[in-house]
Amino acid sequence: MAKEYSRTQRIGDQMQRELAELIRREVKDPRVGLVTITAVDVSRDLGHAKVFITVMGEETPDAVQQSLKALNSAASFLRLHLGRSMQLRSVPQLHFHFDESVSRGVHLSALIERAVAEDRLHKDADESGTKE
């Protein structure tokens, strides 16, 4: 059976695709680096949309803040273009946020790899100690 999506999820998915293209094509602000839109959460009343981004390359807090500042200042411009490309009566207000899940995932992967390496080291030490 096909998974059912709510209207807000479908609108969020379409907004994610449209915004990625608009940012790549229309936003000329040098503060905006290589931005990837990871998710768009649209409120039930379609009044607001949280746009979650990551910044590839430079993930320093300063670069992230500069990109967020530039995107939030371009939000009305992007909203206008979204209104032209999407068939919506009203386009949600855009609020850009940094998505920390990617960096958290990388950190957790590194912790897991380190734990596995330590386990192997202890296992090898135990095996070499019992053979003698």
Swiss-Prot record:
Keyword set, alphabetical order: Cytoplasm, Ribosome biogenesis
Predominant location: cytoplasm
InterPro entries linked: KH_dom-like_a/b (IPR015946), RbfA (IPR000238), RbfA_dom_sf (IPR023799), Ribosome-bd_factorA_CS (IPR020053)
Subcellular location: Cytoplasm
Pfam families: RBFA
GO cellular component, one term: cytosol
BP GO terms, sorted: maturation of SSU-rRNA
Molecular function terms, GO-annotated: ribosomal small subunit binding
Quaternary structure annotation from Swiss-Prot or TrEMBL: Monomer. Binds 30S ribosomal subunits, but not 50S ribosomal subunits or 70S ribosomes.
Family: Belongs to the RbfA family.
PANTHER family per record: RIBOSOME-BINDING FACTOR A, CHLOROPLASTIC-RELATED
Function of the molecule: One of several proteins that assist in the late maturation steps of the functional core of the 30S ribosomal subunit. Associates with free 30S ribosomal subunits (but not with 30S subunits that are part of 70S ribosomes or polysomes). Required for efficient processing of 16S rRNA. May interact with the 5'-terminal helix region of 16S rRNA.
Name of this chain's protein: Ribosome-binding factor A
